[in-house]
Regions:
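Intrinsically disordered, low-complexity basic tails/linkers immediately adjacent to helix-turn-helix/homeobox/MYB/SANT
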Residues: 153-163
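Short, charged amphipathic recognition helices of the HTH superfamily
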Residues: 104-125
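Short, basic alpha-helical nucleic acid-contact segments in DNA-binding proteins
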Residues: 138-153
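Positively charged, polyanion-binding regions of nucleic-acid-associated proteins
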Residues: 87-109
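Basic DNA-binding region of bZIP-type proteins
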Residues: 79-87, 148
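Short, basic interhelical loop/turn and adjoining N-cap
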Residues: 120-136
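Long, low-complexity interaction regions most often at the N-terminus
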Residues: 1-82
Length: 163
C-alpha cells in the first residue's frame, strides 16, 4: 500500500482519522464507496522531478489502488491545489455531518442541549484540537443563513404569485 502525507487543518485530520481509522494512528484507508476516495483518485499525479518526497504532515493517506488506471507507485503526488481541494471536501463532510446531527436534535424535540450534541460528536471521532463553542458558533451561523434563505424565498414567492 502506497501512502502519502498531507498537512490539513488539525481538527479535520482528527475527524478523518476518527471516521475511517477508528481513532487509531497510522495510515488512513478510505473506502472506495466514499466521494473522498474518488476525489483523491482524480487529484493523484506524477511527482515532478524537482519536488522532493515529503515525510511531514498530520494526515497519512493510503492512496487509492484500482485494477485499471493510475498506478500509485507512479501517480503518488498530491499538489498544493489538490491538498486544498481535499481539505475543502473534508471540511464539507465534517460540517454536513455535524449540522445534520444538530438539526436532528432540533427536529426530535431538542432533548439534548446543542453543546452536549457537539461534545458527543467530538468524542465519537476523538477530536481535541477545536473547541465545542467554535463548532456551535459555526452551526448557529449556518442555521441563521438557512433561515434568511427561507425568508427570501417566501418573499419572492409572495411577490411573483400576486394575481
Amino acid at each position: 500500500m502506497i501512502t502519502t502525507k498531507i498537512t490539513i487543518t488539525p481538527y479535520l485530520a482528527e475527524y478523518i482519522i476518527g471516521k475511517y481509522n477508528h481513532c487509531n494512528k497510522g495510515e488512513v484507508r478510505i473506502p472506495d464507496s466514499s466521494d473522498l476516495y474518488h476525489i483523491i483518485w482524480e487529484y493523484m499525479s506524477r511527482r515532478p522531478a524537482e519536488v522532493p518526497v515529503l515525510e511531514s504532515g498530520n494526515l497519512e493517506i493510503a492512496l487509492p489502488d484500482r485494477r485499471a488506471g493510475k498506478d500509485p507507485a507512479v501517480y503518488n503526488y498530491l499538489s498544493v491545489r489538490a491538498v486544498k481541494g481535499i481539505e475543502l471536501h473534508i471540511k464539507n463532510m465534517f460540517n454536513q455531518e455535524l449540522h445534520s446531527e444538530l438539526m436532528d436534535n432540533d427536529r426530535r424535540g431538542h432533548f439534548l442541549d446543542n453543546i452536549d450534541v457537539v461534545h458527543k460528536f467530538l468524542c465519537t471521532y476523538g477530536i481535541e484540537s477545536i473547541s465545542e463553542d467554535a463548532l456551535l458558533k459555526n452551526y448557529y451561523r449556518y442555521r441563521e443563513a438557512l433561515r434568511q434563505r427561507k425568508k427570501r424565498k417566501q418573499r419572492r414567492e409572495k411577490l411573483f404569485n400576486i394575481s
